[in-house]
């Protein structure tokens, strides 16, 4: 099983508001960066969108170490998700994205590692900048 690192971040201006996401996928010395966004969203949705879009790129089951500054995403993957499924996602926010995560993560072994945001972690800083740029692209200017 290939070992992959994924770094991801999400941003929302206004929360909710225009949002962006970015992820870096790394396998050995190869790297791929993705980014995108939505017109009206939250930072948690963008964090999760970054991860889901990154997972869609992988063509075979992998052992993944996910690095995120989102306690929400890390705790959900490492702790909460099992119980959420047992309770049929009752009272869980962003159910659509969590159900998508379950589909796109199938076959992968994922360990989520929380990293402190805005603390000089190079890949997190890159993702943060890209996510903010994507969010800014989606702000409507009033004329």
Curated annotation (Swiss-Prot):
It comes from the Bacteria. The keyword DNA-binding does not apply. Mg(2+) 2 binds at residues 9, 128. Pfam families: RNase_H. GO terms for molecular function: magnesium ion binding; nucleic acid binding; RNA-DNA hybrid ribonuclease activity. One of its GO terms (cellular component) is cytoplasm. GO terms for biological process: DNA replication, removal of RNA primer. InterPro entries: RNase_H, RNaseH-like_sf, RNaseH_domain, RNaseH_sf, RNaseHI. Its EC number is 3.1.26.4. Residues 1-136 form the RNase H type-1 domain. Its main location: cytoplasm. Signal peptide: none annotated. Keywords: Cytoplasm, Endonuclease, Hydrolase, Magnesium, Metal-binding, Nuclease. Binds 1 Mg(2+) ion per subunit. May bind a second metal ion at a regulatory site, or after substrate binding. It is an enzyme of class 3 (hydrolase). Disulfide bonds: none annotated. It is found in: Cytoplasm. Mg(2+) 1 binds at residues 9, 47, 69. CDD domains: RNase_HI_prokaryote_like. Monomer. Belongs to the RNase H family. Endonuclease that specifically degrades the RNA of RNA-DNA hybrids. NCBIfam families: PRK00203.1. This is Ribonuclease H.
